[in-house]
Amino acid sequence: MFLAQEIIRKKRDGQALSDEEIRFFINGIRDNTISEGQIAALAMTIFFHDMSMPERVSLTMAMRDSGTVLDWKSLNLNGPIVDKHSTGGVGDVTSLMLGPMVAACGGYVPMISGRGLGHTGGTLDKLEAIPGFDIFPDDNRFREIIKDVGVAIIGQTSSLAPADKRFYATRDITATVDSIPLITASILAKKLAEGLDALVMDVKVGSGAFMPTYELSAALAEAIVGVANGAGVRTTALLTDMNQVLASSAGNAVEVREAVQFLTGEYRNPRLFDVTMALCVEMLISGKLAADDAEARAKLQAVLDNGKAAEVFGRMVAAQKGPSDFVENYANYLPTAMLSKAVYADTEGFISAMDTRALGMAVVSMGGGRRQASDTIDYSVGFTEMARLGDRVDGQRPLAVIHAKDENSWQEAAKAVKAAIKLDDKAPEITPTVYRRITE
């Protein structure tokens, strides 16, 4: 039997906690036998004293085990259970293509996603732009869709990693969110509860990233790879660029439209293609569906070219109560904004920098995201035809097309876009889409 205050004291004094002590504390968070004050105190001691790798693994596994851990053995699936997690960005619609692409190559992708957070868009919010789409199927239906279609994208239920929800809520109001061991455990507790064989992490770098510097993004990626492999799940991470909007669009319905166009081959933004392919390659190799990069890319290109990936996406939408002909007729189903017109720069020049975070917040301000949990989302608003770093803009080439609910909202968004995009006389050096691959 342990005492919560003694566990806090031990960590306060810089000592390592045992697996048993960590499990006792996390179970107490779940059972409400540990107070909010005690959670806050432990979080702050971890913030200042960090955690060793064994402590990080114990914390993550205890949080995972605080609720249901999915088990797929009874389904006798003929492929690996694989998933991807992104630290979030703007125009990051990779999940909508990646899940169907990997499923079309023989993987099973039980993706449990989140809503928008701060300036970053949420996969669930995007999918809810599709009429009827059900992000909370019951457990049996979720399993059926995975078995029949190969991919489902759903919201987190209260039975998955419940200790994390309470722990995070306390961190949020006690200035202890940005602690690498706590971020790592929070991300992985939910992902490892999916019962995965393999995981790839997409850790963003740059002006629209969650972590403020390249060094901190790399440290987070290394921590996640170390802990997840320590917990028995084959995991790699990619550091990818978020110094500009990843897709050509940012919003909800506009990103779903771009995802369908990507899958059908109607339009593929080159940077979005690079990042999506790189993540899919990691999933195929870690899931043992391909031996190397070349084989993985060939398989992925084939399912794009022969329409199989688009077909899987359509089947997933139908299985989750969306329209059965969504891929063919997406334009008839997705909401459109009242006002859509281009915004132009006040001067000519090359785009040399982009405040991606500010562009994400502009989408939120238009109604495309939430400032508080009770807010309703306007799925139709956002940006399309986003200019990219290095593009030359003038009176002919706009910075973006803004989709807004009215003229006032359009004007505010136009101001935000102009302020977020910096022009120069000469073209900048273009940053890579993938900076680094991190393995155990």
UniProtKB/Swiss-Prot annotation:
The keyword Glycosyltransferase appears for this protein: yes
Parts of the chain that traverse the membrane: none
The keyword Glycosyltransferase is annotated on this UniProt entry: yes
Top EC class for this record: transferase
Catalytic activity as recorded in UniProt: thymidine + phosphate = 2-deoxy-alpha-D-ribose 1-phosphate + thymine
Functional pathway: Pyrimidine metabolism; dTMP biosynthesis via salvage pathway; dTMP from thymine: step 1/2
Gene Ontology MF terms in the entry: 1,4-alpha-oligoglucan phosphorylase activity; thymidine phosphorylase activity
Subunit details: Homodimer.
Purpose of the protein: The enzymes which catalyze the reversible phosphorolysis of pyrimidine nucleosides are involved in the degradation of these compounds and in their utilization as carbon and energy sources, or in the rescue of pyrimidine bases for nucleotide synthesis.
HAMAP family (alphabetical): Thymid_phosp
Family from the record: Belongs to the thymidine/pyrimidine-nucleoside phosphorylase family.
Name of this protein: Thymidine phosphorylase
Species for this entry: Klebsiella pneumoniae subsp. pneumoniae (strain ATCC 700721 / MGH 78578)
Biological classification of the source: Bacteria, Pseudomonadati, Pseudomonadota, Gammaproteobacteria, Enterobacterales
Gene responsible for this protein: deoA
